[in-house]
Amino acid sequence: MNYLEFEVIWGVNNIYSILELNSKLIYEGIFKGKVLETGCKEYSPLVPGDIVLGYIYSSRKVYIDKRLSRKNILWRYNKKADLRQTIVSNIDNVLIVSSANFPEMKNFFIDRVLIVAEEQNIVPIIVINKIDKGISQKAQEFSEIYENLGYKVLKTSVKTYEGIKEVKEVLKNSRTSFIGQSGVGKSSLINLIDSRASQSVNEISHKYSRGKHTTVYSISFHSDSGIIVDTPGIKEFGIETLPFENLKYYFKEFENFASFCKYKSCLHVSEPYCSVTSSLDNGISKLRYESYLKILSELKNYKNYAR
């Protein structure tokens, strides 16, 4: 058998659209057996960005035999399955798209994605979209907080084209996933960058009887700007399987203060002689600290439940 390498573009019901890396031809891929052996229990054995080994068994049809190692994954907690659910793999950047006004910016959502990005060595970029409709006080405040922490923040509008050039610069020669809650204009932003994205989404939506212009599955496509992965609008981005003891390491503003805490195991909550809590509003934003406490509580509750 002549094994070839393929990149997963999208998939549903264990049927995948895969790109042969040499010829750049698209094939339909299925597992040789009932499931793909990956060596661990997981919700999504294959996602856009995965590289797989397979062989052609019929015209434009491939048996997928093996998934190659992933350099990283963008994941969230799937409560129903009680597992990490991989959304996309092998990416360089994640663009976290939020709205400047409505729907209201969800900083807790952004912070959770930032944590996973930091954990997986993915470069996060925060995009505040729909700025032609004005920017809320909350969005402006968090924009400044994130910029002060060193995160790149882009402000965009698909109507005035503001910030679109900067987004294209981020995409150049890289693999980038767009993620955001429903209604923030994520897919409209991608469609402005490359109209072929909308065509791809609509073809899949029509095939599986979904509404038009609705991303229901993660889908990867090669644009002139770079490789883009569009993802479904996500209501919640849980990270419950992250060990709660590690959470503090993903809030970069704690770094310069934590070394002065009396106790090495300090979680920066109510411990005595905590340099982090004594630095609130003096280098550490209270709003970000509130986010830390909320996420820490969720992680602790999950660990207690799991026991």
From Swiss-Prot:
<dbReference type="GO" id="GO:0005525">
    <property type="term" value="F:GTP binding"/>
</dbReference>
<feature type="domain" description="CP-type G">
    <location>
        <begin position="80"/>
        <end position="237"/>
    </location>
</feature>
<feature type="binding site">
    <location>
        <position position="268"/>
    </location>
    <ligand>
        <name>Zn(2+)</name>
    </ligand>
</feature>
<dbReference type="Pfam" id="PF03193">
    <property type="entry name" value="RsgA_GTPase"/>
</dbReference>
<keyword id="KW-0963">Cytoplasm</keyword>
<feature type="binding site">
    <location>
        <position position="266"/>
    </location>
    <ligand>
        <name>Zn(2+)</name>
    </ligand>
</feature>
<dbReference type="GO" id="GO:0005737">
    <property type="term" value="C:cytoplasm"/>
</dbReference>
<keyword id="KW-0479">Metal-binding</keyword>
<feature type="binding site">
    <location>
        <position position="261"/>
    </location>
    <ligand>
        <name>Zn(2+)</name>
    </ligand>
</feature>
<keyword id="KW-0862">Zinc</keyword>
<dbReference type="InterPro" id="IPR004881">
    <property type="entry name" value="Ribosome_biogen_GTPase_RsgA"/>
</dbReference>
<feature type="binding site">
    <location>
        <begin position="180"/>
        <end position="188"/>
    </location>
    <ligand>
        <name>GTP</name>
    </ligand>
</feature>
<comment type="subunit">
    <text>Monomer. Associates with 30S ribosomal subunit, binds 16S rRNA.</text>
</comment>
<keyword id="KW-0378">Hydrolase</keyword>
<dbReference type="GO" id="GO:0003924">
    <property type="term" value="F:GTPase activity"/>
</dbReference>
<comment type="function">
    <text>One of several proteins that assist in the late maturation steps of the functional core of the 30S ribosomal subunit. Helps release RbfA from mature subunits. May play a role in the assembly of ribosomal proteins into the subunit. Circularly permuted GTPase that catalyzes slow GTP hydrolysis, GTPase activity is stimulated by the 30S ribosomal subunit.</text>
</comment>
<feature type="binding site">
    <location>
        <begin position="129"/>
        <end position="132"/>
    </location>
    <ligand>
        <name>GTP</name>
    </ligand>
</feature>
<keyword id="KW-0690">Ribosome biogenesis</keyword>
<protein>
    <recommendedName>
        <fullName>Small ribosomal subunit biogenesis GTPase RsgA</fullName>
        <ecNumber>3.6.1.-</ecNumber>
    </recommendedName>
</protein>
<dbReference type="InterPro" id="IPR030378">
    <property type="entry name" value="G_CP_dom"/>
</dbReference>
<dbReference type="InterPro" id="IPR010914">
    <property type="entry name" value="RsgA_GTPase_dom"/>
</dbReference>
<keyword id="KW-0342">GTP-binding</keyword>
<comment type="similarity">
    <text>Belongs to the TRAFAC class YlqF/YawG GTPase family. RsgA subfamily.</text>
</comment>
<keyword id="KW-0547">Nucleotide-binding</keyword>
<keyword id="KW-0694">RNA-binding</keyword>
<keyword id="KW-0699">rRNA-binding</keyword>
<dbReference type="GO" id="GO:0019843">
    <property type="term" value="F:rRNA binding"/>
</dbReference>
<feature type="binding site">
    <location>
        <position position="274"/>
    </location>
    <ligand>
        <name>Zn(2+)</name>
    </ligand>
</feature>
<dbReference type="GO" id="GO:0042274">
    <property type="term" value="P:ribosomal small subunit biogenesis"/>
</dbReference>
<dbReference type="InterPro" id="IPR027417">
    <property type="entry name" value="P-loop_NTPase"/>
</dbReference>
<dbReference type="GO" id="GO:0046872">
    <property type="term" value="F:metal ion binding"/>
</dbReference>
